[in-house]
Design a protein with these regions (language model features):
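Alpha-helical transmembrane bundles and membrane-interface segments of multipass inner-membrane proteins
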Residues: 1-160
Length: 160
């Protein structure tokens, strides 16, 4: 039940933050939060992560996103009693997927606005709360795969 609350909270924060940007900052405008480190820069991304275009166009991207989201939901259900790293990782990935899928369904593109840089020499891609959720979820999933799953496999092998 706690994970459901986490999922709902992340989706709500993602959608609220995108709404706040769309209603307070014109497209391609920015608001500096911390000089040379963090700004909100309003862009709309019709493609995939990092501004990459999808070879099959926006309709195919939408279909693929729906299918992947359903797959993640299935994994989350299957792993509902597994290790917390797995459950939290999948929950964060699912939350981010739903957040960006909502944008694609309603607007046909995703609102991105968080821009991190280090001085004038390093600038990261512009992203949103949903992207952050997916990234953190992937890190947790990888930590599970590297440390926990390998330990479980080793224990099973030692017991056989």
């Amino acid at each position: 039940m706690f994970l459901l609350g986490v999922i709902v909270a992340i989706i709500a924060l993602d959608q609220w933050s995108k709404w706040a940007i769309r209603t307070s900052l014109d497209l391609h405008n920015k608001k500096i939060i911390i000089e040379n480190f963090l700004e909100f820069y309003h862009i709309e991304n019709p493609g995939m992560a990092f501004g990459l275009s999808f070879p099959g166009g926006s309709q195919l991207l939408l279909i693929m996103t729906v299918l992947l989201t359903v797959f993640i939901l299935g994994m989350l259900w299957k792993e509902r009693n597994s290790h917390p790293l797995m459950r939290y990782g999948l929950s964060l990935i699912f939350s981010g997927a739903i957040g960006n899928l909502t944008d694609r369904i309603i607007f046909g593109k995703v609102t991105d606005f968080i821009h991190v840089m280090i001085g004038e020499h390093f600038s990261w891609y512009i992203f949103n709360v949903a992207d952050s959720s997916v990234t953190i979820g992937m890190v947790l999933f990888l930590l599970y795969s590297i440390f926990v799953e390998n330990k479980i496999k080793k224990t099973k092998t030692d017991n056989d």
